[in-house]
Structure formats: structure tokens, C-alpha cells
Design a protein with these regions (language model features):
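Transmembrane-helix signature of 12-pass secondary carriers
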Residues: 1-133, 137-341
Length: 341
């Protein structure tokens, strides 16, 4: 419930922010909410679900995250061309599902395990478990929890997980969690429209391609759920991470091969007349890196026009294999979905 409240506050405040500091604080609040939800939701599902459904329901938690990302891409595509500050609507619309989530959580029962372990409310927990899986399931689960309490009283310590017999398990668990984030998947999801725009696409086509990214993620998450019990987790991890490596190398090659060309045709595409006039002297020049380009262009424009160039005009000059970028990103997302996702 607290997490859902943080989502609602973050979305509303982000949309209404009047300054940079306010906006950053609002986004941090949302980040705290996301961190909490990612941790709490699967734990709650694991505690409340019957054993035969536990694996599937935890998988569906990830599937719902993927569906949410896809819905966000669709929403952004339809909102991007709104008059005024469309970004406010893109962020503010999140408050609707966040509020629904907040209200719906009041109907969700507390974790039976938590009720027994923390409050010793055995009868309350039994009623909840009976509704979920019947009386037999409730009796068996309560007995398991009671045995867990007895074992807990044997003075197990947190430091025990660092003992040598648990070392391999700890390394694997921490390694997967670390590499899941360090691969940069969140940057790809968050900046997908920007990546495609910098690859030479228009704003509309960039947001449309981001939808394709979301749908690819959704489809291959479903594939992973279907394959995980057939092939096992380790083969999927090996296959997925191998193709992720290939995809990142493809994207690196595409962006590293990009050039920025100034000629009559590319200059004609510039909408801002003052920028076009100021950059006419660069006609015939080609830049092989963005930093080199910015160093030169910055000497031709004042600060405001330079920012406008970076935000809106730079894509007019880039020459890049956009198809290779799209294939690389889609392969990367698909590979992540079946392995680390």
C-alpha cells in the first residue's frame, strides 16, 4: 500500500513539477516505490500462493511488469504529439493505474506467514489460507510455518549465509542480480525512443519503434515462461546472455560507424532558420564523433540555440545504419527476456 501511494505521489508530482529540483525529488520517490515493489511483490506471492501455483504466479508477476512497460510505450506514442508539454501527460497518466493499484490493495489479505510469525494470529491466517487452497492446504501450511518457527529458534544468524558451504549459492545469486542490472536493460527500456531518434528516426517513428521493443519483450517473456520448465533455467541463461553479447556488439558497431554530414540536403532539413544560417559554413564537412561535432557547433551557436540543436536538429545530419540498430536492440531485448528478465 505504501509503495502504491509512492507511485501515485511520484506520477502526480512529476507531471505538476515547476522546477528541476521538484522533478528530481518526484522521480526519486517513484524509484523508491519501484524498488520496493520489485522486492515485496514476489515475496508476497511466494508466501501466499499454493506450492503448485507459486512458480507460475511469480512468473506472471514479471509478465505483468513487461505488460506495463508495453502499455507505457503505447501511451507515450499517443500522447507525444499533444500540444504543450506532452511529457507532463506521459508522466501524469501513470497516476491512474497507480491509484487503482492503491485502492485494490486494500482488498488483498495480509500474508498468512507474516500473521503467524509476527503477530501469532493463527486463526486469522488459517481463514485466509482456507479461502486460497481449502482446509487441507491451510492445515499443512500452518504446520510448515510452525516448524519454520521452531527452526528459527535454533539461533540461526545472518552471518551463516557467508559460510563456505553457501558460497557458491551466494555468488550465483548475487552475480545474476548484478549482471541483470549492469547489462543496461533499464537504460534501453527508458531511453528506447531517444536511441531510435539518435539513429535518425523522426519523433513519431521513434516512439512507434519503442512500441515494437515493448511487444518484443512481452512475446519473448511468454516464450521464456513456456520454455523454462522444458529446457531449464541454466540453458536459457546461457543462450540469452550469448545473444545479448552479440546484440550489444552489433549496436556498438552501428553507432561507432555513424557520421554527421553537413551538406545542402541535410542543412535544408533544419527547421530553425537561425541555426541553419549559422551552420551553413560547415557545408561539406563530415564528423565521425558526436563530441567532435558538438565542439565545433558550440562555437557557432549561443547556448539556447545549441541546446535546440542537440534536442531537435542533430538527427538531420546523422548517417547511420538504422536497420542494424533496430535489429540489435530487438535481439538484445528478446535475449534478455528469455534469460535475465
Amino acid at each position: 500500500i505504501v509503495v502504491a501511494a509512492l507511485f501515485t505521489i511520484s506520477a502526480s508530482w512529476s507531471a505538476l513539477a515547476t522546477g528541476y529540483t521538484e522533478f528530481i525529488i518526484a522521480r526519486i520517490i517513484g524509484g523508491v516505490g519501484i524498488g520496493g515493489a520489485i522486492l515485496i511483490a514476489p515475496i508476497y506471492i511466494a508466501e501466499i500462493a499454493p506450492p503448485k501455483l507459486r512458480g507460475s504466479l511469480v512468473s506472471f508477476n514479471q509478465l505483468n511488469i513487461v505488460i506495463g512497460i508495453s502499455v507505457a510505450y503505447f501511451s507515450n506514442y499517443f500522447l507525444v504529439n499533444m500540444e504543450g508539454e506532452s511529457w507532463r501527460w506521459m508522466l501524469g497518466v501513470e497516476a491512474i493505474p497507480a491509484l487503482i493499484y492503491f485502492l485494490a490493495l486494500w482488498t488483498v489479505p495480509r500474508s498468512p506467514r507474516w500473521l503467524i510469525l509476527k503477530l501469532n494470529k493463527v486463526e486469522h491466517a488459517k481463514k485466509i489460507m482456507t479461502k486460497i487452497g481449502g482446509e487441507d492446504y491451510a492445515e499443512i501450511t500452518i504446520a510448515e510455518i510452525q516448524r519454520g518457527i521452531d527452526k528459527k529458534e535454533e539461533n540461526a544468524k545472518l552471518s551463516d549465509i557467508f559460510k563456505s558451504k553457501y558460497a557458491t549459492i551466494m555468488i550465483i545469486a548475487l552475480g545474476i542480480a548484478f549482471f541483470q542490472q549492469i547489462t543496461g536493460i533499464n537504460a534501453v527500456f527508458y531511453y528506447a525512443p531517444t536511441i531510435f531518434e539518435q539513429a535518425g528516426g523522426s519523433t513519431d517513428s521513434s516512439f512507434l519503434q519503442a512500441i515494437v521493443v515493448g511487444l518484443t519483450n512481452l512475446v519473448f517473456t511468454l516464450v521464456a515462461i513456456w520454455l523454462i520448465d522444458k529446457l531449464g533455467r541454466k540453458p536459457l541463461l546461457l543462450i540469452g546472455t550469448s545473444f545479448m553479447t552479440v546484440a550489444l556488439l552489433m549496436a556498438t558497431f552501428a553507432f561507432n560507424s555513424a557520421t554527421y554530414n553537413f551538406n545542402a540536403a541535410t542543412l535544408e532539413k533544419v527547421n530553425d532558420t537561425e541555426i541553419r544560417t549559422a551552420l551553413t559554413s560547415l557545408e561539406g564537412k563530415t564528423f565521425t564523433s558526436q563530441s567532435e561535432l558538438f565542439n565545433v557547433v558550440q562555437t557557432k551557436l549561443d547556448e539556447e540555440k545549441f541546446l535546440n540543436f542537440k534536442r531537435n536538429e542533430i538527427t538531420n545530419f546523422i548517417q547511420i545504419n538504422a536497420t542494424l540498430v533496430l535489429i540489435a536492440i530487438l535481439l538484445y531485448v528478446a535475449s534478455f527476456a528469455i534469460s535475465l528478465g
